[in-house]
Each structure stands twice: as C-alpha cells, then as structure tokens.
C-alpha cells in the first residue's frame, strides 16, 4: 500500500498542470492550487524518504507486472532526496513567479509548463528502467523548450536554438545507447542490466555503449558540452533561470551518478578517469567564465558550470568518499543555485543593471541583503559550517584516495576563483562608485525577502545538520555502488540469466 504513494510526487504536479490550463484567467486560484500541490508533493516525498531511511527502498510495479517486464518506480535514498529537494525549490520558484505577477507569461500557460517540466524531473529521479528515463527526459526537455522561448525576444530565440540542437543530439545519442544496450543485454531494468553487465565482465561493445551514454548525459549536465548554458540562462527571467540552474543540469548529473556507479562500474578503468578529466576541463572553463564576464547573470551561469565539475570530479574518483561527496554536493547545489539566481535576479531588479561595475550604495539601502549574499558565497565556496563544506571535503578525500592530485588542486583553485568572482560583485555593491553617483534603487518586495530568507535558513540548516544529510547520501552511495545489495533490496526475485 505504501508503494502506491510513490506515484504521487509525479502524478500530483501532472494533474495540477492540466487543471491550470483551464484557470489561466484566475491567478488567485491558480496560485493557491499550484503552491498547495507542490507543498503536498514535498511533504509526501519527505515522508517517503524518512520511511526508506528507517526501513528499505520502496518499489512500485505498474499494472501488476513485476520487473524486468513492467514499468517500475524506485524510491531509494538517492531518488527520494533528489525528489524532495527538487519539489521544495520548485515550490519556492513558483511562489517567486506568482509574486512577480507575470500576467503576460500566464497567458502562455507558464505555470503549467513549469509543472510539466517538474513531472519530467521528478519522473527521471523515480524511474527504475532505461526507456522510461528517456521518456521523462523528453517530457522535461519539451517543457523546457517552450519555457526558454516564451519571452519571444531575439536573444531568447538564439539561445533556444543552441539549447534545442544540443539537447536533441543528446536525446538521439541516449536513444541509440538504449537500443544498443537492449540488443546486448536484453533488458532495460536497472537492476537487471547491472546483473547482466556484471556477468559479461569486460566487453568492448559495452564499453562503447557506456561512452555513448557518457556523451548523452554530459550534454544534459553541461559537462564540457556547456555551450548552450550561459546564453540560455542569461536571457531567462529570474524564476526560470533559477529553475533551469537548480534542476536541468542536475538531472544529467544524477543520471551520470546512477549509471556509472550501478550499471557501468566494471568499466571504471576507462570511464572514471575520463569523467575526472572532463570534470577538470569543465571546472577550468567555468572559472575562466566567471572572471571574464562583467554581466552578473553570465557570472551566475558559469558558477553552475563550475559546480557540475565539482560533482563529476567526485564521481570520477570512484571512491566511496568521492561519490558520497558528489551526491551531497549535488543535493546542496540545487538549493544554493536557486539562492544564487534569486539574489542575482533581485540585484538586477533593484538596481536596473547587469554589469557589476555599475552597482554601488546598496549597503545603505538593504544591509540584510548583503548578509544573504555573503552566506551564499560561503556556501558556494565550501566554507564551514555552511552547506557546501561537507560535500567538498568528501570530494577532496576521494581525490586524495584516488591519487588525483591535479583534480584536487584544480578544485581548490576554481573554488577560490568562484568565491573571488562573487566577492567582486559584493565589493562593487557596497563600495563601488559610478561616476560618484549613487544608483537609484528600487525597494526589494517583501515576498522576495521572505523567499530569500527561507533559502538562507535552509543553506545554513544543511550545513549544521550535515550528519543527517550525510546519513542519507551514504546510504545512497552504498546501495548504488553494490549491485548485489541493490538486487537484494530492490528486485530480489531477479537473476542475471532470467
């Protein structure tokens, strides 16, 4: 009976999206329906996560067809902490959007498309078979294609073209990988694939397939293949930029973690060093981006790229500590990047400028805003006791155990550069000078202050309650790095030769 609740985090947003299509002219009802739905979704996800932590993973077999023949949803520590975190930030993002009163965007069913994107994101975390992961990716991407073009500006359309082309190529590669893998192992269920690949051992065909998935998911995660990201994020409004930054690349990172711990772990002599190399390249280019630009929205976009490098570096260490740190940092980064883009969006709103050298005098108007900015910088930099610290320490530990001293050095350097680029914005906000004149600021709306306050509290809470979060991420790491344990807890009836 409890397993039936596993469909609700995806079903509730889907039903709400359909209802909102017919309520586009009633903003008040739409607001309460959406926020109520996502709040309930977050609570249900958290309850399921608590149950899984105390007992065992939950599976839901649709239509009474057990794995590997039927569609299966899996609620384990990894999937449910991702669903809970994603549902929480989506709730805040939509509260932010309704607070802005985006009436023009509502005519294009903006809330519905955000919910459809949420369905794809949450479904990607919950599904336990390869084809349905592809379906969820396509739902997510179709909704994102619409959202990225809603403004109808030339800049958005140009960014959308790059975004669409690269993601279509990624989807083709994903589908090609699915076909080749099914031909090779004859199944699409995760646990069944893991068992059969383990029985096959080292195989050139499987290695080629794993490389195809690596490229496909790298395009989704902006790992090296990030050309679409800075331009796309820079032209979006604040809530959509926060939504994309918090979730879109993280789904790709999640898929990389799930695939290259559980499914293709026996090919780590090739894949994991390649992942570490790609992570290093991503970190370096991201660091160059945050230094090169004066546009604060593009600086924020390159911060996303750096964080993806951190996460995948942890995965590339192929150690328990590194993978555990990657999962922790992945969860943390969803919240922190939401906070970053809300702060950057608020800066643009209250000052009217996107170039940091034109920001000055904010200290006199909004001193508490500066406190939120500093906390965000420390969280991104991994300064104790804030939320970025535990994940980075574990990734450091994993890199040391793996002997990846170059990756470790690059992570330290790029972390400092990431902090420097944000402190540079902070300096101009408080001590900068624009021809000796003070910028005429708008007042930060109360709803923005409330949402920023909630995110700041959560960032601090993650750092303080790190042992609780690490307990979840450690369980997730243990389950996904042991295919035998995964089979025992998820699908004990399956055998490799079935």
UniProtKB/Swiss-Prot annotation:
Location(s) in or outside the cell: Cell membrane
A biological process term (GO) from this entry: ATP synthesis coupled electron transport
Top-level taxon in the UniProt lineage: Bacteria
Disulfide bonds: none
Keyword Ion transport set for record: yes
Membrane topology classification: Multi-pass membrane protein
Main subcellular location of this protein, as a coarse class: membrane
One GO cellular component, as annotated: plasma membrane
GO terms of molecular function: antiporter activity; NADH dehydrogenase (ubiquinone) activity
Family, as annotated: Belongs to the CPA3 antiporters (TC 2.A.63) subunit D family.
Self-association and partners: May form a heterooligomeric complex that consists of seven subunits: mnhA2, mnhB2, mnhC2, mnhD2, mnhE2, mnhF2 and mnhG2.
Protein name per Swiss-Prot or TrEMBL: Putative antiporter subunit mnhD2
Species whose genome carries this gene: Staphylococcus aureus (strain Mu3 / ATCC 700698)
């Amino acid at each position: 009976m409890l397993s039936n609740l596993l469909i609700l985090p995806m079903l509730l947003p889907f039903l709400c999206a359909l209802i909102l299509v017919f309520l586009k002219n009633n903003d008040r009802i739409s607001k309460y329906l959406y926020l109520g739905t996502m709040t309930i979704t977050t609570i249900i996800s958290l309850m399921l996560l608590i149950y899984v932590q105390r007992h065992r993973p939950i599976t839901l077999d649709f239509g009474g067809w057990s794995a590997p023949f039927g569609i299966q949803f899996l609620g384990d520590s990894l999937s449910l902490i991702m669903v809970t975190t994603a549902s929480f930030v989506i709730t805040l993002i939509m509260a932010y959007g309704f607070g802005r009163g985006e009436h023009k965007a509502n005519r294009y069913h903006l809330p519905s498309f955000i919910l459809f994107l949420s369905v794809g994101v949450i479904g990607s975390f919950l599904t336990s078979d390869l084809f349905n992961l592809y379906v969820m990716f396509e739902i997510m991407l179709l909704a994102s294609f619409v959202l990225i073009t809603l403004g109808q500006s030339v800049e958005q359309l140009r960014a959308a073209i790059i975004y669409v082309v690269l993601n279509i190529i990624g989807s083709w590669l994903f589908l090609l990988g699915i076909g080749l893998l099914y031909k090779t192992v004859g199944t699409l269920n995760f646990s069944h694939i893991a068992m059969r690949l383990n029985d096959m051992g080292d195989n050139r065909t499987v290695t080629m397939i794993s490389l195809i998935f690596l490229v496909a998911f790298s395009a989704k995660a902006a790992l090296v293949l990030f050309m679409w990201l800075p331009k796309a994020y820079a032209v979006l409004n604040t809530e959509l930029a926060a939504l994309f930054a918090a979730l879109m690349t993280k789904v790709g990172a999640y898929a990389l973690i799930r695939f290259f711990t559980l499914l293709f772990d026996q090919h780590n002599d090739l894949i994991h060093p390649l992942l570490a190399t790609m992570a290093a390249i991503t970190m370096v280019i991201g660091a160059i981006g945050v230094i090169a630009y004066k546009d604060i929205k593009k600086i924020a976009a390159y911060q996303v790229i750096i964080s993806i490098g951190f996460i995948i570096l942890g995965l590339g260490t192929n150690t328990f500590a590194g993978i555990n740190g990657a999962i922790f940092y992945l969860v943390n980064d969803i919240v922190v990047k939401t906070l970053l883009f809300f702060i950057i969006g608020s800066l643009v709103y209250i000052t009217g400028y996107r170039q940091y050298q034109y920001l000055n005098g904010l200290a006199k108007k909004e001193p508490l805003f500066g406190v939120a900015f500093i906390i965000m910088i420390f969280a991104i930099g991994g300064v104790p006791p804030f939320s970025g610290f535990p994940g980075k320490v574990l990734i450091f530990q994993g890199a040391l155990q793996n002997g990846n001293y170059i990756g470790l050095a690059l992570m330290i350097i790029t972390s400092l550069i990431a902090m420097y680029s944000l402190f540079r914005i902070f300096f101009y906000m408080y001590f900068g000078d624009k021809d000796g004149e003070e910028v005429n600021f708008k007042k930060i709306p109360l709803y923005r202050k409330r949402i920023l306050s909630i995110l700041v509290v959560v960032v601090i809470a993650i750092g303080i309650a790190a042992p609780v979060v690490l307990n979840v991420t450690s369980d997730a790491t243990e389950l996904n790095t042991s295919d035998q344990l995964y089979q025992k807890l998820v699908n004990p009836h399956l055998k490799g030769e079935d």
